[in-house]
C-alpha cells in the first residue's frame, strides 16, 4: 500500500515534467497528493457546515434557548471577527510551520469547537448556553483561518501545472459544499426544538473524521521533489517580505479588495438568506432549498470553469465575465426576494447567483498566486481571505442595521413574535456593492501571469509537458536562442552528475518549512 502511494508517476505521463539539466531535481508527482487533497477538502467541508449550521434554523434556535436574533447572528459573525486578527497568524503558520502542521492544528480546533457547541444540549442544566455556542464557534472560526488559505498552497506544492486549478477548485469548493449540506440538513433535522441536540451531534461526525485522517494520514508538508518548476520557488520570500511585496503590488491589492468584497457579499447572503426569505412568506425548507441550489450550481460551475482555465489559462477573462454575470443576478435577487409567491423565480435566481459567483472563487485564488509570484501561496490566498472576512463583517452589520420593522399586513413565516423585518434597502445595497466591486475589477485590473512565465522560462527541455502555447510569455525567442536549449557538442559538458541532482533535491527541501 505504502509502495503504491509513494510510486512516482512516469515522466511520459501528462502529470510530470522536467529536465535533467536543472539544478533542482526533475519535477515529479506522487499519488499520495490525492490523500492530502481529500483531508483538506473534508476539513474545509466540515468547517463550513459548522459555520452555517445555526443560520437555516435561526428562529428555532433563538426561541428554544431564549436568545435574540442578534445573538444568533453573532454565531455566524464571530467567523468574520476572529478571521481578521488571526488570519495573519494563519498565513505565518502556513508559510513557516508547514501545510501538514497547519492542517492538523485546524482539524483539532474544528473538532474541539464542534464538541463544545453541543454542551448546552446535555441533560444537565446549563446556565448560559450562548457562552458555549460562542466558544465553540470561536474555535471553529480559528480553524477556518487555517483551512481556507490552504487550497492554493496545496495545489502549488503537490500538483503539476496542468492540475493546479482543478486541485484548487476541489479543495476550495469543499467549503460551499459544507454550506450546502448545512442548508439542507439543518432544516431537515430540526422540525421542532427537541431536535436541536440531534442536529448538533450529527455535525460532530465529519469534524471527528477530518481530525482523525489529518492526524494519521498526513506524513509531510511537501513531496520529496517539487511537482513543477514554480513550486521550487513558491516560498522563496520570507513572511514579512512577502506581505510587503503583496501590499506594493497594485494588481494584487485591487484583486484582493474587489474579490474580498465579493466574499463578503456571498458570506452575508448565505448567513442571512433564511431571515430574508421568511420575512416574505417563504418557509425554512424553501430557504434551505434556495441555499442548496445556490451552492450546487456554484460547485458545478467551478468544476467546469476549473477544467477550462487549466487548459487555457484564461484566469483574468473568466474572472471578469463571471463577476459581471454575478452582479446582474444580485440585482434580480434584490427585487424578486421581496415579492410573495415567486418560488420558481427565486430558485432560478439563486441557482444562477451560485453558478456565476461561486465558480470564480478557485480561479481568483490561482490568479492571486499568478500575479504575486514568487510570494508564498499561503500569503497571497490568505490575505484575500482576511480582507474578505473583514468586508463581510462590515457588510453583514450594515445590512442588518438598515432593516426596519414592517407595520403593514405581513406574510411572514418567521417564528418570532415581533413584526417581520423589511430587507428592501439592505438588499439593494448588497446588489450595489456587488456591482461596484465588479466594475472596478473589470475596468482597472490587469496583470501578467508571473508564475507561468517563470515556469516557461525555467524549462530546459523541448519535452517539458507544456500544456498550452498561450501560457508562455508573448515575447518570441529565435529557435537558436531558446532559453535552456544546449548545443549538442556542449550537452555532455553541462549534464549534471548525481551529486548536482542530489544538491538540487537538498535545496528544494531546505526552502520548505519543516514538518511538525
Swiss-Prot record:
SUPFAM superfamilies: MFS general substrate transporter
Superkingdom as given in the UniProt entry: Eukaryota
Biased composition (Basic and acidic residues): 1-10, 504-516
Keyword vocabulary terms for this entry: Membrane, Transmembrane, Transmembrane helix, Transport
Principal location: membrane
A Pfam cross-reference name: MFS_1
Record has Transmembrane as a keyword: yes
GO CC annotation terms, alphabetical: membrane
Residue ranges of the TM segments: 34-54, 74-94, 104-124, 139-159, 170-190, 199-219, 253-273, 289-309, 321-341, 344-364, 382-402, 425-445
Gene3D superfamilies named in the record: MFS general substrate transporter like domains (1.20.1250.20)
InterPro entries assigned: FLVCR1-2_SLC49-like (IPR049680), MFS (IPR011701), MFS_dom (IPR020846), MFS_trans_sf (IPR036259)
One GO MF term attached to the UniProt entry: transmembrane transporter activity
Region (Disordered), start-end ranges: 1-22, 453-516
Topology with respect to the bilayer: Multi-pass membrane protein
Cellular localisation: Membrane
Matching PANTHER family: MAJOR FACILITATOR SUPERFAMILY PROTEIN-RELATED, SOLUTE CARRIER FAMILY 49 MEMBER A3
Protein name: Solute carrier family 49 member A3
Underlying gene: Slc49a3
Amino acid at each position: 500500500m505504502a509502495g503504491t502511494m509513494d510510486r512516482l508517476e512516469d515522466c511520459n505521463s501528462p502529470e510530470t515534467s522536467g529536465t535533467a539539466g536543472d539544478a533542482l531535481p526533475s519535477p515529479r508527482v506522487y499519488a499520495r497528493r490525492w490523500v492530502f487533497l481529500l483531508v483538506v477538502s473534508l476539513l474545509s467541508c466540515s468547517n463550513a457546515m459548522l459555520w452555517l449550521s445555526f443560520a437555516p434554523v435561526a428562529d428555532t434556535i433563538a426561541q428554544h434557548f431564549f436568545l435574540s436574533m442578534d445573538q444568533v447572528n453573532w454565531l455566524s459573525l464571530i467567523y468574520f471577527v476572529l478571521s481578521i486578527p488571526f488570519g495573519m497568524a494563519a498565513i505565518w503558520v502556513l508559510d513557516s510551520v508547514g501545510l501538514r502542521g497547519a492542517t492538523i492544528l485546524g482539524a483539532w480546533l474544528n473538532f474541539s469547537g464542534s464538541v463544545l457547541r453541543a454542551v448546552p444540549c446535555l441533560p444537565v442544566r446549563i446556565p448560559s448556553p450562548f457562552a458555549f455556542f460562542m466558544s465553540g464557534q470561536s474555535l471553529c472560526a480559528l480553524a477556518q483561518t487555517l483551512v481556507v488559505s490552504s487550497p492554493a498552497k496545496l495545489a502549488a506544492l503537490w500538483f503539476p501545472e496542468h492540475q493546479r486549478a482543478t486541485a484548487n477548485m476541489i479543495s476550495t469548493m469543499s467549503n460551499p459544499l459544507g454550506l450546502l449540506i448545512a442548508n439542507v440538513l439543518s432544516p431537515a433535522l430540526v422540525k421542532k426544538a427537541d431536535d436541536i441536540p440531534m442536529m448538533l451531534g450529527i455535525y460532530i461526525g465529519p469534524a471527528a473524521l477530518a481530525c482523525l485522517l489529518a492526524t494519521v494520514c498526513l506524513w509531510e508538508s511537501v513531496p520529496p521533489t517539487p511537482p513543477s518548476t514554480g513550486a521550487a520557488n513558491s516560498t522563496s520570500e520570507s513572511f514579512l517580505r512577502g506581505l510587503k511585496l503583496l501590499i506594493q503590488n497594485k494588481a494584487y491589492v485591487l484583486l484582493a479588495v474587489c474579490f474580498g468584497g465579493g466574499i463578503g457579499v456571498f458570506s452575508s447572503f448565505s448567513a442571512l438568506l433564511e431571515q430574508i426569505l421568511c420575512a416574505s412568506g417563504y418557509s425554512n425548507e424553501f430557504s434551505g432549498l434556495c441555499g442548496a441550489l445556490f451552492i450546487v450550481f456554484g460547485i458545478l460551475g467551478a468544476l467546469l470553469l476549473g477544467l477550462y482555465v487549466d487548459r487555457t489559462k484564461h484566469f483574468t477573462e473568466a474572472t471578469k465575465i463571471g463577476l459581471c454575470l454575478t452582479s446582474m443576478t444580485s440585482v434580480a435577487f434584490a427585487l424578486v426576494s421581496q415579492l410573495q409567491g415567486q418560488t420558481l423565480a427565486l430558485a432560478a435566481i439563486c441557482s444562477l447567483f451560485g453558478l456565476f459567483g461561486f465558480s470564480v472563487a478557485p480561479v481568483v485564488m490561482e490568479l492571486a498566486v499568478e500575479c504575486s509570484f514568487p510570494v508564498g501561496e499561503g500569503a497571497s490566498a490568505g490575505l484575500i481571505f482576511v480582507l474578505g472576512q473583514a468586508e463581510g463583517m462590515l457588510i453583514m452589520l450594515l445590512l442588518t442595521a438598515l432593516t426596519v420593522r414592517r407595520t403593514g399586513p405581513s406574510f411572514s413565516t418567521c417564528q418570532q413574535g415581533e413584526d417581520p423585518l423589511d430587507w428592501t434597502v439592505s438588499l439593494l445595497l448588497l446588489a450595489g456593492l456587488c456591482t461596484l466591486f465588479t466594475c472596478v475589477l473589470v475596468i482597472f485590473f490587469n496583470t501578467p501571469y508571473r508564475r507561468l512565465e517563470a515556469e516557461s522560462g525555467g524549462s530546459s527541455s523541448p519535452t517539458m509537458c507544456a500544456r498550452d502555447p498561450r501560457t508562455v510569455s508573448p515575447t518570441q525567442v529565435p529557435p537558436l536562442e531558446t532559453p535552456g536549449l544546449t548545443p549538442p557538442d556542449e550537452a555532455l559538458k553541462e549534464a549534471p552528475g548525481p551529486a548536482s541532482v542530489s544538491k538540487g533535491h537538498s535545496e528544494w527541501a531546505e526552502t520548505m518549512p519543516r514538518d511538525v
